[in-house]
Amino acid sequence: MRPLVAARRRAAACCALAACMLALAFAPAAARAERLKDLAQIQGVRDNPLIGYGLVVGLDGTGDQTMQTPFTTQTLANMLANLGISINNGSANGGGSSAMTNMQLKNVAAVMVTATLPPFARPGEAIDVTVSSLGNAKSLRGGTLLLTPLKGADGQVYALAQGNMAVGGAGASANGSRVQVNQLAAGRIAGGAIVERSVPNAVAQMNGVLQLQLNDMDYGTAQRIVSAVNSSFGAGTATALDGRTIQLTAPADSAQQVAFMARLQNLEVSPERAAAKVILNARTGSIVMNQMVTLQNCAVAHGNLSVVVNTQPVVSQPGPFSNGQTVVAQQSQIQLKQDNGSLRMVTAGANLADVVKALNSLGATPADLMSILQAMKAAGALRADLEII
């Protein structure tokens, strides 16, 4: 009897182990813990865009055609006037602006200068700038940006930009032929701007009351962050105001705030799984879906519609001695063709791999698939939100 009992126990243990392995295999994967700095950002700690208008000089004959871009010569005249040089001497007949309008400059280009002022930037810090042609310059390669003030949205000057440009493209032309690689009408200057004014510290003005803004609104993730912060710093440190904003009680002293924020940003939180969503790009035909998308059983019939337009020139020749003129006309033939589409069964998909397999079985192009997905959503077979960008 004892060997029989032992065998039964071993069999029961094996069945229990197999059941546990099956449960683990089919259980949904737990969300991976992420750092808080990857899930949210501190309100007020952000970049600030800067913009300015300036001139690039030293171009090898590839600058603006000044007869077509009068603002280039006007800007150059204003800059020279600020340097004490006047070019509007005029003539005896009173042509006060003839010198400016007759300037044929090929080595100058009007440009827009943009930069990003990082948070907590101090005067004297160097930042990168991007220089983009505003007129019809062929290339900015080899040019030098003259001193350009960069302003913020409030109209204040926050940085001054100047320096030699680095253009990633290259091009050559001869006898009407032209070869170009990459973009020649824009370039960058590494460290080309010096910060002259700092943005007021928004964190220091909050008197120890900070707010976290989640990158993606989710009530579950917000609650998990509150629980993690309160477990690490004590009860009452964090309070969720809504699904995106969390209020924090931080030390009022700036030195303690740095240590508090450094510890806070490295907290690991497991975010909630994202809502099922399908992104459709109507311009490029791209379709992206996340892992939460599922399908229900449905039948799909989709026929391709094609339009073919064939245009041929037709010459109408007048008779001899008729004083007529030869006329060239266009003769067009238009064909409209629609392929027959039969119903196809699309099986249900419980995960992303099954959904991809089911959609690929239709054999539709991305453009057709966009219409099919919208119809599936309307029929209730697609369990996801559709977003067209």
Curated annotation (Swiss-Prot):
Gene Ontology molecular function, alphabetical: structural molecule activity
Subcellular location: Periplasm; Bacterial flagellum basal body
Top-level taxonomic group: Bacteria
Record's signal peptide: 1-33
An example Gene Ontology CC term for this record: bacterial-type flagellum basal body, distal rod, P ring
Any Pfam family the entry gives: FlgI
GO terms, biological process: bacterial-type flagellum-dependent cell motility
Keyword entries, A-Z: Bacterial flagellum, Periplasm, Signal
Coiled-coil region list: none
Function: Assembles around the rod to form the L-ring and probably protects the motor/basal body from shearing forces during rotation.
UniProt family annotation: Belongs to the FlgI family.
Assembly information from the UniProt record: The basal body constitutes a major portion of the flagellar organelle and consists of four rings (L,P,S, and M) mounted on a central rod.
NCBIfam families, per the entry: PRK05303.1
Name of the protein: Flagellar P-ring protein
Species name: Burkholderia pseudomallei (strain K96243)
